[in-house]
């Protein structure tokens, strides 16, 4: 309420959807639950927007079929989120699949956002991957930010400081302009076509 930023909360079970819906702006279905069909059915009946993260080993077709499950429940407020897939590479937490952006935009009408924080697991990779996501046409970004990442209770290694986040946003504005996109006035909500 103080910042005006929307709150996204991960819901883990179908039984928790109505409770979580009372306290959040957007319901998140995490990567591990992308094929939890009872949960997809429940968020499909919810009145709040749903952020559907891609699973570690989920193909584009499987991800879009999971999205269809939500849409079939009556909830058309659906956002897809690329957050990295599992590959043989071990340096990063995951491999961020930026190819997913134009593929999903071609195959679906749904907006796609990118989470380079979870997609890489390393703060120094967040900015370049976020900028690449904007250039590739992402509708928005999810970025972990913390005033002191070394003291964060979770996700510190992938969190940007406020200063680094400001630098990222300066870069986002520049890349968005270069690819003829606009950054929303409430910048953390992302890039608009």
Where in the sequence are the language-model features?
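Catalytic cores of alpha/beta
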Residues: 15-22, 60-66, 121-139, 147, ...
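Glycine-rich phosphate-binding active-site loops on the catalytic face of alpha/beta enzymes
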Residues: 31-35, 133-158
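N-terminal active-site wall of soluble small-molecule enzyme domains
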Residues: 1-24, 36-39
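Active-site beta-loop-alpha junctions enriched in small/polar residues
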Residues: 12-14, 32, 55-57, 83-87, ...
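Conserved anion-binding
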Residues: 26, 32-99
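Active-site/ligand-binding-proximal alpha/beta "capping" segment
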Residues: 71-133
């Amino acid at each position: 309420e103080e910042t005006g930023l929307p709150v996204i909360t991960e819901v883990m079970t179908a039984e928790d959807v109505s409770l979580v819906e009372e306290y959040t702006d957007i319901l998140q279905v995490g990567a591990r639950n992308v094929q939890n069909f009872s949960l997809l059915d429940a968020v499909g009946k919810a009145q709040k927007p749903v952020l559907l993260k891609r699973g570690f080993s989920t193909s584009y077709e499987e991800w879009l079929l999971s999205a269809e499950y939500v849409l079939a429940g009556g909830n058309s407020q659906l956002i897809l989120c690329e957050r990295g897939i599992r590959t043989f590479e071990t340096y990063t937490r995951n491999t961020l699949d930026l190819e997913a952006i134009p593929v999903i935009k071609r195959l679906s009408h749904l907006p796609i956002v990118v989470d380079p924080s979870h997609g890489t697991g390393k703060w120094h990779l967040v900015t370049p991957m976020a900028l690449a996501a904007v250039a590739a046409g992402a509708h928005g970004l999810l970025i972990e930010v913390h005033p002191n990442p070394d003291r964060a209770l979770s996700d510190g290694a992938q969190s940007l400081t406020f200063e680094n986040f400001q630098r990222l946003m300066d870069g986002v504005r520049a890349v968005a302009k270069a690819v003829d996109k606009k950054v929303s006035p409430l910048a953390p909500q992302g890039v608009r076509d």
